[in-house]
Amino acid sequence: MKILYFTGTGNNLYVSKKIGGELLSIPRLLKEKQFDIKGEAVGIVVPCYYFTVPYIVKEYLEQITIEADYVFTIMTYGKMMGGGLNPIEKILKRKGVEVDYSNKIQMIDNFLPNFEMEQQLKTEGAKNIETQIKTIVTDIQNRKKEKKRIGLFQKTATTLFGKMIFSAPGRKRIQKTSAGFYVTDACTGCRICQEVCPRGNVDQREKIETKPGPKFGNRCESCLACIHLCPENAIHLKSQKSSVRFKNRNVTTAEIIAANSQN
């Protein structure tokens, strides 16, 4: 079994590890131009961004070929997912690949412009994350065939947001998310921000006003990994609702670097 995943702060890597099999990071696969995926079972585990899939996931899926007897998709989300799984199924269907099983997992949301991390962390117990994962793992082990039903409102929300996000102006706006980042004097130049970026959008070799500090480009994926994983909490977003940071406790920063580094 092969799992194609995308992670920013560890949630989707953790879910992928719990499912098991050979874990393949989408940013690494994209960088290495590995588009032929073959296996008895192939799974796609990704987060929900703006009621749809992250652009990096869409970009990769549109280039792949999949040969498998069993295909499943899992999407993690914080509050609302809309019809986020639908774009994946549509892309794969155009390639002649039918999804056998799809499901969702509600987890901690790390999107700082919308959520106070203090409040998000308090919801962890109520979300029964481990129970959700256990159910999905069992379903996959049993090769269950069932797709998550998506209502009309959910489909509509995903369609509308998808058109905005994936349009040329929408894409450009997302890529410029890092224009709203700023770095404090707490920065030590450790380069973790550079290594966890799935787009190679951070250059720690540059200096800002003669001080160590990352230089952000215009290829941001809006995953906020660089902000959340900074060990000194030195990177901030002007529109953030919280200075508290999040990383899935079951995943190490080193694992996220291995998954995302473009260096």
Where are these regions (language model features)?
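Iron-sulfur cluster-binding cysteine motifs and their immediate structural context
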Residues: Y182-V183, T188, I192-E221, A225-S243
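FMN-binding flavodoxin-like domain, especially the glycine-rich phosphate-binding loop
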Residues: K2-I3, T7-V15, G20-V46, Y50-R171, ...
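A mid-sequence, solvent-exposed acidic-amphipathic segment
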Residues: T156-E195
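Short amphipathic alpha-helical segments at helix-loop
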Residues: E118-L121, Q175, A179, P212
